[in-house]
Regions:
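Outer-membrane beta-barrel transmembrane domain signature of Gram-negative proteins
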Residues: 64-86, 95-177, 297-308
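Flexible loop and strand-edge segments within Gram-negative outer membrane beta-barrel domains
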Residues: 3-24, 30-91, 97-116
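Membrane-embedded beta-barrel scaffold of Gram-negative outer-membrane proteins
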Residues: 1, 90-104, 201, 209, ...
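Short beta-strand-initiation
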Residues: 24, 76-78, 119, 236, ...
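One face of beta-strands
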Residues: 52-53, 120, 178, 196
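Sequence/structural signature of outer-membrane beta-barrel proteins
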Residues: 2-10, 48-52, 98-107, 141-148, ...
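Outer-membrane beta-barrel domain signature, especially the mid-to-C-terminal portions
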Residues: 10, 14-19, 52-56, 68-70, ...
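Structural signature of Gram-negative outer-membrane beta-barrels, strongest in the C-terminal barrel
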Residues: 34, 42-44, 83, 130-134, ...
Length: 310
């Protein structure tokens, strides 16, 4: 993909649309095995060179302050696979590895980051009467490093996990999914994340879903808040940033409408509510020359509704 035509329709001397050169290569292999057991491997490579900024910018200005520009080189490769063990029970080993490298500048502020993620899990899928049970164990390796003040040393952690899920089919119209996941993070201790999902299908054209659960997320500040890298404001981190934690619930209604001429319309409506016990929200208002980050004082909520027609 290539887009290299700078546009400035509002005449502010800044590009209106990000310019980019991108290449992506993907390949998947499926292996034929006895008893139709699954074994597949897929690989992908991605490279992108994107920039935006003043209309006069070109790569010779990269990293300087003579002409402002934001330039990002991204190189990423990943491999993933799924292997069904040659045993009577249905047990799969799933694995993946990704390597992500970002070389970027925001004016004369460099942001250099590397992330490597390795993942493997064993999943046992067992059907018993009206129950479809998934039982599994996983391990995740994460390496992250960048050149910002928020990362004094490379962040390297291995997180083991256990999880169980039971989907109960009461009738053809109703089912209930119960799940629990346990992770151990050496930085944050024991992490439990339960979830519940109810599905009701009163007709072939109507589906109602109700989901609830908890959330836990470690924030990588500068990968998510690029405004902190532009150099326009000083970045202030007032305390050690804790993980974001939340409780959430959402309801979804899906309606299919068939017309006599053969056309199909799908109406999708969702509403959600999230209660955060901690969230990392940038403060742009206290000081116009600073972006201040700290842990949430109290709680925060997020509510919303969406409607889509397809």
């Amino acid at each position: 993909f290539n887009y290299s035509n700078p546009i400035d329709n509002n005449n502010d001397n800044f590009t209106d649309v990000t310019l980019q050169d991108r290449i992506s290569i993907f390949q998947k292999w499926d292996f034929k095995r006895a008893n139709n057991r699954k074994f597949s491997i897929a690989g992908r490579y991605f490279y992108e060179d994107r920039w935006g900024g003043e209309m006069q910018w070109n790569p010779s200005y990269r990293g300087g302050n003579e002409v402002y520009g934001e330039s990002i080189y991204t190189s990423r490769f990943e491999i993933l696979g799924d292997y069904q063990l040659p045993i009577t029970e249905k047990v799969n080993f799933q694995f993946s590895y990704s390597d992500h490298d970002q070389n970027s500048v925001y004016g004369n502020t460099p942001y250099l980051a590397q992330q490597r993620i390795g993942f493997g899990q064993l999943i046992w899928d067992k059907k018993v009467s009206k129950h479809d049970v998934l039982l599994g164990a996983a391990v995740r390796y994460n390496y992250y490093n960048d050149n910002t003040t928020a990362t004094l040393n490379a962040d390297e952690v291995t997180i083991p996990s256990l999880f169980i899920q039971d989907e109960i089919s009461f009738t053809k119209k109703q089912s209930l999914l119960l799940g629990m996941r346990y992770d151990y993070d050496s930085r944050h201790g024991n992490i439990f994340t339960p979830r519940i999902a109810y599905r009701f299908k009163p007709t072939e054209d109507d589906i109602i879903r109700l989901n609830a659960g908890t959330g836990f997320r470690v924030v990588n500040l500068f990968t998510e808040e690029h405004a902190a890298l532009t150099g326009a404001r000083d970045v202030i981190i007032e305390e050690t940033l804790d993980p974001e934690e939340s409780y959430n619930i959402n309801i979804n209604y899906l309606k299919k409408l068939y017309l006599k001429n053969g056309m199909l319309f799908t109406f999708d409506t969702s509403a959600w509510y999230t209660y955060f016990t901690n969230a990392i929200i940038p403060d742009y208002d206290t000081n116009p020359n600073q972006i201040i980050y700290d842990n949430l004082d109290g709680y925060s909520t997020s509510t919303g509704i969406s409607f889509n027609i397809d």
